Amino acid sequence: KNLVDPIKCTFDVQVYGKTIAQVVEAEVLRQLDKSNNNHIGYFHQNIFRHIGNGWVVPKEGYDVENGQRKIFVEMKNKHNTMNSSSSQKTYMRMQHSINKDKDALCLLVEVIATASQNKAWTISLDKIAISDERIRRVSMDKFYEMVTGDKFAFKRLCEVLPLVISDVVSSLKQSEIVQNTVLTELSAIAPDSLLKSIYWLSFQKYQGFDDFHFR
């Protein structure tokens, strides 16, 4: 289980004037959002295994590949999600790929890019700007165009996405839909204090917490 941080909860209650229930609800939503982001990343990557025409999602290595066209893709959600070290590591990995095969094309595909683009990726290594036309920075719309031949393919996907998600969710059994029972579970642990329940869950194996009481 992802435990709620009791120290942070205490600060949030005292500093921001929130109730403990509000703080717990906000933390649960944050954790659900993090999990949802992982599912979204899975969706962006794995949709290409259903497109065919040589596109695959390998178990390891690049996120998406096309062996026939020798295209290797690293996918990121936003243009600012990689720090300098991560960017350099990714770029050097792509350099290794194009050095092994002169016909290889490596792409950093960004779901949310700064612009619609398909351009050489330029980075700084040891304060020196380097680039290669075979290592490219590509926005998601341009990548969908590259994959399907339709420059509006990504736009068309976005147009039907709400309907598709709604259909999938409505087809789920009630037991498969995420239920938020955290407050109920916490209340069962210490009916007199939600905050006490949170402390006990996190620190129950610590010395003295078997007899924990707020002053």
What is each residue range found by the language model?
Residues 1-42, 203:
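Interdomain/boundary linker segments immediately adjacent to catalytic/signaling cores
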Residues 35-59:
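Short N-terminal edge-element motif at the start of the domain
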Residues 47-51, 94-101, 202:
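Hydrophobic, Leu/Ile/Phe/Ala-enriched alpha-helical segments that form helix-helix packing faces
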Residues 58-60, 67-68, 100-103:
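Short, well-ordered loop/turn elements at secondary-structure boundaries
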Residues 63-65, 107-108:
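A structural signal for short, well-ordered beta-strand segments and their strand-loop junctions
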Residues 64-82:
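Conserved catalytic cores of phosphodiester-cleaving nucleases, focusing on short active-site segments
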Residues 79-145:
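Catalytic cores of nucleic-acid endonucleases
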Residues 123-215:
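Charged, structured surface patches that assemble and position nucleic-acid processing machinery
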